[in-house]
């Protein structure tokens, strides 16, 4: 009987020591570790992914911890682990949804091809996947520009933060939504767009602007894109715009190299 009790005590202390080691001893990842937890992952699958990345010591201890803490919801997403942390701290991050975001900087003048490459460089996916959306998903702008053949000109330049759980269409939709917000602020609407909208949107400095008839959104965006490609110097854009609009008024070809892109 004493031998049995001794073995039992040793087992209890052994399990307790193992739990203390797994639960409370901090773990330092070997460099930056990105862990992608996709929607629908079970607690067991999450634990396996964390242990494989060297973020926790034991998947079994993680599962026990999770069960004894009322099975708190663990958020799907991509996580970056690069600092020493206890298992409880790892669990807390997943409960909070402390998801890693990728910053994408889209400068003025970027074409949809440049944007696609920037998205790929940020680690958000393939440039070809983004282009497939940008070149075909016209539904995102069908109310603004029914005749548009792509999203070119409607992917607003800005600094964005995206997660890897967002689809390429989600990313494009965010950029189009930013375009809509700015377009609404400057009065660029399907019925009220004019050449002066180019001044307001920032592609031409304030000052004398070419006169002309009202233009729809598609024509205004196309002209803005041509002017921006023609010169990178803001002070020159008013002159370029004046030349182009005068040519249009006289029904003369623009003779602008960038117009080939937007033909």
Predicted feature residues:
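Conserved catalytic or metal-liganding residues and their short signature motifs at active sites
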Residues: 1-196, 201-202, 206-255, 262
């Amino acid at each position: 009987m004493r031998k049995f009790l001794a073995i039992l005590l040793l087992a209890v202390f052994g399990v307790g020591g193992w739990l203390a080691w797994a639960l409370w001893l901090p773990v330092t990842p070997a460099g930056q570790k990105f862990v992608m937890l996709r929607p629908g992952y079970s607690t067991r699958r999450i634990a396996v992914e964390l242990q494989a990345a060297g973020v926790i010591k034991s998947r079994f201890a993680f599962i026990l911890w999770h069960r004894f803490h009322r099975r708190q919801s663990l958020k799907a997403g991509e996580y970056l682990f690069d600092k020493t942390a206890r298992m409880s701290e790892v669990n807390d991050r997943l409960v909070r949804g402390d998801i890693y975001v990728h910053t994408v900087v889209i400068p003025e003048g970027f074409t949809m091809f440049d944007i696609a490459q920037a998205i790929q460089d940020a680690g958000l996916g393939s440039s070809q996947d983004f282009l497939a959306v940008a070149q075909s998903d016209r539904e995102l702008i069908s109310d603004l520009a029914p005749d548009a053949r792509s999203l070119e000109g409607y992917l607003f330049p800005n600094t964005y933060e995206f997660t890897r759980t967002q689809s390429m269409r989600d990313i494009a939709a965010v950029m189009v939504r930013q375009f809509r917000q700015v377009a609404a602020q400057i009065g660029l609407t399907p019925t009220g767009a004019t050449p002066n909208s180019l001044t307001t949107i920032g592609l031409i400095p304030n000052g004398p602007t070419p006169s002309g008839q009202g233009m729809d959104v598609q024509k205004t965006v196309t002209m803005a894109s041509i002017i921006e490609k023609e010169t990178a110097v803001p002070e020159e854009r008013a002159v370029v715009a004046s030349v182009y609009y005068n040519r249009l008024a006289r029904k003369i070809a623009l003779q602008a190299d960038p117009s080939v892109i937007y033909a």
